[in-house]
C-alpha cells in the first residue's frame, strides 16, 4: 500500500503542476532530459516525500543547462524497506 503524500509534498506538486499549465507553455520545450524536469520533480516528491524529493528535484534542475548533454535521467528507485534484521 502506498503511503499518503504529506501536505508539504501536495503543495509542492501543485506548484509544479501550475508551472506546467501556466509557465511551461509560454517557454516552449526546453528541457534536455527525459522525463522533463517538472515530471521528474513530481515523481521524486511522490516517491520520496517533501525533503528528499525536493533535494532530488533541485539537483536535477541545476543539471539542466546548455553545457549538459541531457538524455535519459529517471528518478532513482526507492531503497527496499524489507531489509533482513
Swiss-Prot record:
GO terms for cellular component: plasma membrane. InterPro entries: Membr_insert_effic_factor_YidD. The keyword Transport does not apply. The keyword Ribosomal protein does not apply. Keywords: Cell inner membrane, Cell membrane, Membrane. It holds the Pfam family YidD. It comes from the Bacteria. It is found in: Cell inner membrane. It is a peripheral membrane protein. SMART domains: Haemolytic (SM01234). Could be involved in insertion of integral membrane proteins into the membrane. Belongs to the UPF0161 family. This is Putative membrane protein insertion efficiency factor. The lineage of its organism: Bacteria, Pseudomonadati, Pseudomonadota, Gammaproteobacteria, Enterobacterales.
